[in-house]
Regions:
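AMP-forming adenylation/ATP pyrophosphatase catalytic core
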Residues: 35, 147, 177-275
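Compositionally biased, low-complexity flexible segments
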Residues: 1-29
Length: 275
C-alpha cells in the first residue's frame, strides 16, 4: 500500500464541488477567476516560497526524518526538501509495497529517488491478509495505514531517525481520511498540513525544483476502485491495474479511474475532448 493519499470511491458531484484555488503560475494549468479577491500570482508564489523555508526549518529542528514515500506529488516534494535540508545520512524514504500499490506508481517513486539521490528502502506490507482490510469497510484505510506505520515506525527507531512523516497537506484535512487516525496513533507527523501547504503550492514548488511529479494526477490505492463492502482481493486489484494501464497505453492522460463492479467496470476521466 502506498504511503500517499488513499480514498474510497468519490462521486463526481463531490469532485465538482471543490472550491477553486488560486493557481501559482503553473505551466498548462488555468487559474480560476471565481473569486473577486484572489491573491496575485506573485504574492501567492512568494507565500509558497516562505512556507518552503519554514518546512526546511521544521526538518532542521528535528534533525532527521523517515518519509512515507509513495512517489505521489506530496511525498516526492517532502522527500526532496528533507534531503536538501538534512542530507542523505539523515533522510530515508520508505516505500510500502503490496498488491494495492500500482507498479506504475512504484516506477515514478524510484525515478524521483534516483534522480535526486533520495535514499530509499522498500518494505512489503501485509494488509491484504488482514480480514478487516479485505472486507473493505468504510474505514479500510485505517487498517492499511496501521499496517504501514506499524512497519515504518520501528525502522525509524532502529536507525535513529527522529520523526516519521507523511505527505498529508492542508487540502486533505476536510476529506474522509480514516488512515489519519492510524498515523496519529503511531506519532506520525504531517508537516505539509501543519504548515498550511495547499496542493497547488506543493505543485508550484515541485515545478520550481524540477520534480517530475509536479503535475502528476492524484493516485489513490487500487483498493479505492472497489465499492465499500466488495472484498479486496489481489485478482480484482490486478484486473483494475491492467485495465488502467491499457487505457494509459492509448494515450489517456490526467485523472483516470477504472471502478470495479464485478462483471461491470466504470471508467472515470477528466472532462475534455477525446481523440
Amino acid at each position: 500500500m502506498p504511503a500517499g493519499r488513499a480514498h474510497g470511491p468519490r462521486p463526481r458531484a463531490a469532485l465538482a464541488a471543490r472550491r477553486p484555488i488560486a493557481r501559482l503560475g503553473l505551466p498548462h494549468r488555468e487559474a480560476s477567476n471565481s473569486f473577486l479577491a484572489m491573491p496575485s500570482p506573485d504574492h501567492a508564489a512568494a507565500d509558497a516560497v516562505a512556507k518552503e523555508s519554514r518546512l526546511a526549518d521544521w526538518f532542521r529542528a528535528h534533525g532527521s526524518a523517515l518519509i512515507g514515500f509513495s512517489g505521489g506529488v506530496d511525498s516526492a516534494y517532502l522527500a526532496c526538501v528533507a534531503l536538501d535540508t538534512l542530507g542523505a545520512a539523515h533522510t530515508l524514504a520508505v516505500i510500502g509495497r503490496s498488491a494495492s500499490y500500482p507498479a506504475a506508481q512504484w516506477a515514478r517513486a524510484r525515478e524521483v529517488a534516483d534522480r535526486f539521490g533520495v535514499p530509499v528502502l522498500e518494505v512489503d506490507t501485509d494488509e491484504m491478509n488482514d480480514p478487516r482490510y479485505a472486507a473493505n469497510p468504510v474505514n479500510r484505510c485505517y487498517f492499511c495505514k496501521s499496517e504501514l506505520w506499524g512497519r515504518l515506525a520501528p525502522i525509524a527507531a532502529a536507525r535513529g531517525l527522529a520523526v516519521v512523516v507523511d505527505g498529508t497537506n492542508a487540502d486533505d484535512l476536510g476529506d474522509h481520511r480514516p488512515g489519519a487516525q492510524a498515523a496519529r496513533e503511531r506519532g506520525v507527523h504531517s508537516p505539509l498540513a501543519e504548515l498550511g501547504f495547499t496542493k497547488d503550492e506543493i505543485r508550484a514548488r515541485s515545478a520550481a525544483r524540477g520534480i517530475p511529479t509536479w503535475d502528476q494526477p492524484s493516485s489513490p490505492c487500487l483498493s479505492s476502485r472497489l465499492p465499500y463492502g466488495t472484498a479486496v482481493t489481489s485478482l480484482r486489484l490486478r484486473r483494475v491495474e491492467e485495465a488502467e494501464a491499457a487505457l494509459r497505453a492509448l494515450g489517456i492522460e490526467g485523472n483516470l479511474r477504472v471502478r470495479y463492479f464485478g462483471d461491470l467496470a466504470k471508467v472515470e476521466l477528466d472532462p475534455g475532448p477525446r481523440t
